[in-house]
């Protein structure tokens, strides 16, 4: 369990500060399950959801607090999406994290942020801003992967397409869903049903909401790019199949007269003079070669290939 006071900066503390002092407490789901006695949270701590139960980003408003969960598309050390639970009161912020991912984020806030009037709302704004601070770079990396896959398709290298394409579709969908849910959280903070924040502090959450919307639009563009890339791949597959069918059609067209010739002379009627003529076999061979040659010439003239 880690305590931080909110003043002109975020300051680590060894002990819990006074209830009237704005503060942040970081703990694990296991520590939360023991319902510890935390100053200023006696009546509200039980509303805090554990990180292990987090599945989506959400915010639930109550008369004396706001609580919810956050699930990020980025993965932790165990390969699972990063998740945390949170609770907000007028003077306290509770963060529940089982992956130690938020500890580095809080240290970054303590190192980089300076506030004239430190408050819970100001910390929350910077906390959520830090959550999405590097997301644009992550989306750009996804865009680069899409472009690389597109170049691969245009180069007719289609063998290793399906697996990375499926991964990209799932990843872009996860980011889009994340921003849609995070927008709902930002909306709950901006509406300030509990009256925890001043009008100027509500503007901060409005700014955060605008940024989330822009990131959601960016992720939607990536989803559309994936759909277009899938269409391009399908068009390339169709072109390849059409080329194969064209070759088969040409071969069939060229040798169809020979099939007729073989079927004709394969009947072996007694009255067929070519069967007993000593030049019958060579003549049939020559006729077959001439027929194939004429068929090839016609196909070439018609630009069938």
Go through the PLM ranges and name each one:
Residues 113-116, 188-206, 223-238:
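Hydrophobic alpha-helical transmembrane segments
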Residues 39-40, 154, 204, 269, ...:
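Aromatic-residue hotspot detector
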Residues 1-191, 211-214, 304-305:
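Peripheral, non-transmembrane regulatory/ligand-interaction domains of membrane transport proteins
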Residues 26, 213-305:
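Hydrophobic alpha-helical transmembrane segments and their immediately adjacent juxtamembrane loops
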Residues 104-106, 111-113, 145, 171, ...:
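Generic alpha-helical propensity signal that fires on short helical segments
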Residues 125, 159-166, 173, 199-206, ...:
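Alpha-helical membrane and juxtamembrane elements of multi-pass inner-membrane transport
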Residues 154, 161, 180, 187, ...:
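Alpha-helical coiled-coil oligomerization motifs
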């Amino acid at each position: 369990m880690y305590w931080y006071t909110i003043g002109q900066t975020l300051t680590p503390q060894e002990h819990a500060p006074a209830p009237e002092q704005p503060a942040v407490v970081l703990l694990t789901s296991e520590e939360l399950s023991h319902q510890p006695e935390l100053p200023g949270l006696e009546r509200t701590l039980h509303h805090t959801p554990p990180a292990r139960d987090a599945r989506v980003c959400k915010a639930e408003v109550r008369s004396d607090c706001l609580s919810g969960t956050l699930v990020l598309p980025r993965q932790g050390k165990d390969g699972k999406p990063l998740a945390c639970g949170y609770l907000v009161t007028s003077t306290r912020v509770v963060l529940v994290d089982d992956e130690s991912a938020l500890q580095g984020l809080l240290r970054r806030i303590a190192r980089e942020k300076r506030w004239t009037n430190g408050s819970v709302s100001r910390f929350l704004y910077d906390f959520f801003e830090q959550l999405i601070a590097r997301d644009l770079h992550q989306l750009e990396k996804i865009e680069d992967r899409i472009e690389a896959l597109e170049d691969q398709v245009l180069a007719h290298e289609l063998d290793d397409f399906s697996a990375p394409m499926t991964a990209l579709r799932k990843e872009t969908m996860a980011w889009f869903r994340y921003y849609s849910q995070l927008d709902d959280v930002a909306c709950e903070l901006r509406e300030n049903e509990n009256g925890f924040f001043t009008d100027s502090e509500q503007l901060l959450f409005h700014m955060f909401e605008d940024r989330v919307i822009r990131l959601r639009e960016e992720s939607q563009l990536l989803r559309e790019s994936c759909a277009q890339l899938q269409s391009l791949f399908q068009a390339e597959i169709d072109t390849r199949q059409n080329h194969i069918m064209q070759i088969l059609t040409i071969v069939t067209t060229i040798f169809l007269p020979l099939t007729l010739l073989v079927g004709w002379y394969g009947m072996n009627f007694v009255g067929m003079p070519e069967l007993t003529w000593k030049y019958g076999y060579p003549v049939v061979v020559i006729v077959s070669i001439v027929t194939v040659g004429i068929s090839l010439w016609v196909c070439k003239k018609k630009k069938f290939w």
